[in-house]
Structures are given as structure tokens and as C-alpha cells.
Amino acid sequence: MSTNKKTKIVATLGPACSTREVLKDMIEAGVNVFRVNFSHADYSDVKAKIDLIRGLNDEFGYTAAILGDLQGPKLRVGVMNEEVIVNPGDIITFQTAEDVPGTKERVYMNYKEFPNDVNPGENILLDDGKLMFEVISTNRTTEVVAKVIQGGPLKSKKGVNLPNTKVSLPALTEKDIRDAIFAIEQKVDWIALSFVRTAEDLMELQDLIAKHSDHKIPIIAKIEKPEGVENIDSIITHCDGLMVARGDLGVEVPAHEVPLIQKKLVHKAKTARIPVIIATQMMETMITSLTPTRAEVNDVANSVMDGADAVMLSGETSVGNYPVQVIQKMTQIIEAVEDSPLIQVPQNTPQIKTNRYITKTICQHAAQMANAIKAKAICTLTNSGYTAFQISAWRPQADILVFTSNKRILTQLNLIWGVKTFYYDKFVSTDDTIDDVNRIATEKGLVTKGDMLINLAAMPIANKGMVNTLRVTEIE
């Protein structure tokens, strides 16, 4: 691959990137993870694209990962009868009993408990907050009467946000359960859950994965509701990664509060040593233009400097005119800023004496020693991928080279900052294995004569136990 960036790029699949040639060009330009958006997914189409990506991985030695993104409990209005414009002061009834074409006076809502959950005075937001209504009354069964506060075109199937309402929807809808089972069958590398409000939401998905998969599939919690922000500490203990989903979050909370929430969530994720993805509207103008705005360039750069593991593109790659060029531009921005000394890493050392304490401590010191001796790379042998997460979290200047015989984590770890993975299944004595992976790193041009290299391994190596050994080598 032509890029040596450490921050990863997640690109959403869609009609704009449906050919093998475009997917290959996107990987070459810097895509590390492809996202399947199950809000707009046809199973046969998704399976075909996943097969194409895995075919490219096999043929060219790529490690592109697949992220399945579940829609979650998304509220929507029904189909409108005609072009409807609502004006401030208009009165409109939302009904849940019957899905009839909508008019200026009455519109269907796909959420049966809506009349029971809302209260007078609460807001209803439509179409990413473009329209705002205030609840006047509810009959608690099938109808809610609301007044238009902010008007405009009321369009079919547009999303609904209820920022002041505690919704009683399940975290996993029936559609999500079907989509998750399909994603598990496709052996996706990561599953993201939308609108996570509590740790219990994640436990439901964990139980579903355990029931249908022989392997653990790591879960990313998408934070896009105020409750998710409030409960972030308990959510972090039950997920494997975070996504700051700024689209719905910027509707559910005032948009001007999102920048500080983003920084807070990134800091929490880094402190917990789990990966974090920044998503939504990063290069939005590049859907139709070859040039991003200065504000978009700054947004990508600032997200990298906040410490994001990955930045994500949605419409830019799924339906945009320039799916390859937007990746090239994003890679350019990342490479320009990610080595900045202004990027801060939380220096909280492992304190709690868990059974992973030794591994955590060795990974921390490997990263710090690599910076001190200006090592070119940190090589680790891993079966679970745990050491890769831990080393990456300390953001060493050295490359993180992961050698594993576990084919599932070859692609899974491609989301993690700074990590490059290689298949390796010749585990002999510790000394011989370390010499062997160092030779491979040299052959691949990742280190050269005179470079310092740090190796992490478990002794005895055949047991594939927890890392307990750190060795420094000068490449000869």
C-alpha cells in the first residue's frame, strides 16, 4: 500500500463503490475498513461486495476489514401524499395506528409507543432537525397533537428525533436482529450498534452474537443520544470500541455542544484503551465536489489530533461522485498532522492488578521505550489481538507490527491505530521466532539495517499465553 498513515479510514459501501476496480483503488488510497450500513442494505448486494473485498485481500495481501453497522431503533414518519409544507403555528397530528399517506394535518409515525412516551412540552425533530414541533397533547394510545415551531418541507420517510423523551424502544429491533444474524454469518470483523443508551443495550447484542457465533465479534457502541453521553462510563466497560456519530447526536443535543462531547468521548475511549471512530459529515462537500472546504479539512485534522483511531466517510463513498479521490484527500490530511507533538495521550498507567496486568504494563513500557530509543517498529506475536489494542493505545511513534496465526484478527485489527498485521504460523522457540519475524519485517522493508526494533512475546511461545517478555534488537 502506498500510504504509511497510522490513523485508519472507514469507508461506507454503496452504489458509488460497487465494482472491484473502485474497491481496489480505495484500498490503495488508504481505506482500512469498509462499513455496511444496514439502514440501506440488500443482503445479496452486501454479500457480493464482502466477497469482492475478501477476494482482493486474498489476491493482493490486503487486510481490509468489514464493519456491520446496525440501524438501531430509528424513528421515521410515513409516506407523504404530496409535497407538504408546514409553517410555524400549524397544528399536526402524528398517528401510530394506521399507515396512511400523510397530509398537512395528519402524518403516520412508525413507533407504536410514541403517544405513551411523549409528554406535552417535549420537542419532535424531523429530517435532521430541519423541522421542529412541540407536543401539545397525547391520547396515550394512538395520537399525538403537535404545533409547528420551525417549518419547511415535510418529506416522506424522514427520520424523527425525540431529544427530551425517554423512548421505550428496544436497543435491537426485529430488523436489527435479522441484520446482526446475517452479519455474523458473513463473519464480519466488527458490529456497530446505533443509538446505544445503556450498557444493557450492548449486553443484548453480546448475547445474540454468543448464540450465533463461535467467535467473539467485537462491538462498537455508537453514541448519538444524550443518554449515551450520560452513561458513557458504564457503556465503555461493555463495548470494544466507540463511534462518535455526530449526525444524530447533533440533532439530539444542540449542535454547538457536539465538539466538546466529541473531545470528551475520545478522551474516555483513549483512557479505557479502546478504539474510537469519528463519523458524519467529515468531507460532505466531496459528495459532489473534488475540493473539500477548509472547515472540513480542519475537522478531519482536529479529529486526528484529538486522538481518533479512525475517521469515517458515509455518503462521500457510498453515493458520492469521487469515492477514490475523497480517500486520497483524507489520507493526505491524516499524514500531514498525525505526527504532531500537540497530540496528547492519557498517561494513566495500569493500576488494577487484573490477570492482564503484566501484559498491559509490558505494552505500556514497550511504547514508551520505543519512543525513548527511537525504535522503528514494535513487533508482537498475538493470538487474541489484545496486545495490539494495548500498544496502540499508547500511540508510539514506531510502527506496530502484529504477527498472528489467527486469521480472524488479521482483518479485525485493521481498525486499530498504527497496527499492521501479518499471517505467521511458525511458532518454534522464542529466540528463533523473534529472529524470524524480524527477518520478515526487514524483507518487507519495514525496518532496515541499524534500526532498533522491540519484540514482545509470551514464553514459552508454544503455549500462546499472555505476553511476558520484551526484547530490544538492532537490525543487522
Residue map of PLM features:
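Non-catalytic helical/linker scaffolds that mediate oligomerization, partner binding
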Residues: 1-476
